[in-house]
Amino acid sequence: MQIDMNKLTPMMKQYLEVKNRYKDCILFFRLGDFYEMFFEDALVASKALEIALTGKACGLEERAPMCGVPFHSANSYISKLVENGYKVAIGEQMEDPSTAKGIVRREVIRVITPGTVLDGNLLENKKNNYLLSLYKDGTNIGLTYVDISTGETNATCLNEDKVIEEIAKIHPTEIIINDLDFIEKLRDIATVSNIYINESFSDNYLDINILKEYFPDVYLQKLKFDDKGLIKSSLSILLNYIYNTQKQITSNINNINIYNSSEYMVLDMFTRTNLELTQTIRGNKKKGSLLHVLDKTSTAMGGRLLRKYVEEPLINKSKIENRLDVIEEIKDDFILREDLNDILKNIYDIERICGKIAFERVTPKELIHLKNSIEKLPNLKDTINLSNAKILKEYVSEMDKLDDIYNLIDEAILEEPTITIKDGNIIKSDFSDELKELREISKNGAFLVKEIENREREKTGVKSLKIGFNKVFGYYIEITKANFKQAKLDETYIRKQTLSNAERYITPELKEIEEKILHAEEKIKSLEYEIFVEIRDTIYKNIDRIQKVAKTIANIDVFVSLATVAHINNYVKPAINENNKLDIRNGRHPVVENIVGEENFVPNDTYLNRGENIINIITGPNMSGKSTYMRQTAIIALMAHIGSFVPAESADIPILDRIFTRVGASDDLSQGQSTFMVEMNEVSLILKNATERSLVILDEIGRGTSTYDGISLAWSIVEYIQKNIRCKTLFATHYHELTDLEEEFKEVKNYSIAVKEDGEGIIFLRKIIPQGADKSYGIYVAKLAKLPDEVIERAKYILKDLEKNHVYNSVAINGDKENNNIINSNLDEELVKVNQSNFKNKYESLKIEHELIVKDYKHIKKDYDKLNSKFKALNDEVALMKQNDDKEKINQEDSVKEVALTQISFDSVNRDILSEEILNLDILNMTPLDAINSLYNLQRKAKEIKS
């Protein structure tokens, strides 16, 4: 939009001069009691904020588009713009309009971006707001991130292929990077995680001289920067950007934590999402996540630190055990736990108060909050020292009580100060002799005004006469029109204003008193502001001391929270090992249990160990609880690594370097990727990065493609993990063929979810049992989902037809030479009938089918042997029961329980008949088709007896 600057009014010209320096921002331009926006900014903001778009005369032929928001409520509008990815520049009046000569001087005092928000109303109390910078040099990257509201600063260097995982862990709200080409690789995670990527990089951000403005040379020399200067460069980008937006150097950024990402368990973006660590998959809400269950923190500082614990599981055994020991001390001491909770709930957000002090935006009320928090420190320290918590005592042994800071605020600031620092009523009179004297004058002035009011009432004869005040012409005498005619007014009364029902006057005496009073009140406000700034600056110089105390409080709060959760939910202290054995007894899913209650949750064991079983194949119908079981195993392992007690009867957890999850299905339509492609990409990531020390959760791999492709891929993936990676793996599948892997590899074991058939329906028992499932129960599940009866009945008919006629489902092979000849003969006959043009494709298809049939026989033969063994045992039981028929009756309840696990049921009256028929079967001399038909008939008879 081309604008002729020469035609603009002076004010509008000033606006555009400021706007041109902040072209990528929406400029909030202060005009009196409003922030106004003009031209393109007005068009954008009015739409985003849903406010009226008007116009203003600007010197051009057309009025300038304009919209505005009230100064006193601007924060809510700024918040909405920032949340929608806009940057907001605050153009403030730098002088008093009443004393300004000409146009009021205006300047941008700060730029608000997603990563530089300071206002508490725009921030989540228990979540950090990180600004992250990246400096890329080749494939190496320096990464630094800071929460400017607390001053927390962390830095590391890593390879570019690790950056996405690190960003997923940190979850910044804004990223700034020197390599604009690399931005494209960040688009996906930025979209998924709602991260603002700042593309307005300036080479000035690389000026490392900024480091000396924040840190002494001695401190910088002690820091372990990388040899290539990656961290120095990324830190310089960050600090220069902060200075450019906030227009000042801040003292709360005074300590850098340089860390190595290998110190923590690696969790990729998919795993964090699938396990719902800090927010749910649906709705992105904290409620329903692991963090929601664990968070009983009393302070905002503790809440933020707990989130960091969950996001960054430790892999150092001694550090994990130290946390566990502290939590155990608190959990086992009910009185200590309750006392600490009572103290902590009265402590304010000290970290963010420090941030506001550093940016000169702290209010008097917030300093009172700081004082009240410091007041709790002696009690906190004494409570811990009087307990038996030996390790916890170490945390507070050298904790600064900040007595000097407390005394300063207590002596100076009123308990109930005004909200704004320039309106007075902030400082106690006894803190300053000058202030005390001025307040006496002000107080007496009010008395003098009252005296004048009483005297003028007598003089004029108007009893309702009153003296008021406004900012336009100060003190005035008001007489209502009803009393005007009887009023005896002399020449000292000077009319100033006529209202509909009253007249207002001033007198020389009133003006003389006014000057004394107003001078005193203005001086009081000015002096109070000066004193407040001095107090703020004194505290500012001690921010590092206060921040250390805040960090100690946050740690104690997290320990108390985890101890409280462990006590309430009956969690146990896990053992931590380095021998790669995972052994969970009666484990529970913490989130699901929190919803349904411990008494309604069915616990399950998980055992994974080298030499015995490193891969568990889990079969069972949909909705039976496979995914919940696998997720709970991963979550219990992760909880142990953050130093938390876990929901189990006992748990022995190995140090894991990574947890991978491939759970659920979703299309990535924005990238043109199908469910199956997304699945394969995630599996590829796992196979490339998993190690022997990893835990892998795979759910229904291969379901996004054809049956044969799916089985082949799933089989091959399990083989690859077993032979090449050898990591602990839970592999859920509906391909029952994969249970044959147990025979191929001794470290692969079959498990399934127990199901009880109940007439036409099924009951999910939610219990993991050591055997593969023999049915998928798909139609049963469809019935539970309330599909139309017509659909269900038709599905049953089709299923029976498929089971009867399809080679793959109907033929069982012994695997010996004779039966292989039968299959080969059948295949030859089939091939003769095939059209010559389709010969090759048909042959390959039948060849694959033949191989699957051979494999399937082993599964069927194994199940038959088990079945036959159970039949024989059952026959013996029937004989025994007949002998003791007069002594006892069959316990029908026990019989039903047996049905749930074996899925075999016989009426006690007819058991001997059916058993005799089973014993007379000569299964090994039957053809495969005869064998399967005989088994089918026996199953049918058993069902008839049951019904």
UniProtKB/Swiss-Prot annotation:
CDD domains: ABC_MutS1. ATP binds at G620, P621, N622, M623, S624, G625, K626, S627. Belongs to the DNA mismatch repair MutS family. This protein is involved in the repair of mismatches in DNA. It is possible that it carries out the mismatch recognition step. This protein has a weak ATPase activity. GO terms for biological process: mismatch repair. Disulfide bonds: none annotated. SUPFAM superfamilies: DNA repair protein MutS, domain I, DNA repair protein MutS, domain II, DNA repair protein MutS, domain III, P-loop containing nucleoside triphosphate hydrolases. The lineage of its organism: Bacteria, Bacillati, Bacillota, Clostridia, Peptostreptococcales. It holds the Pfam family MutS_I. The keyword Chloroplast does not apply. SMART domains: MUTSac, MUTSd. This is DNA mismatch repair protein MutS. It comes from Clostridioides difficile (strain 630). The keyword Repeat does not apply. NCBIfam families: mutS1, PRK05399.1.
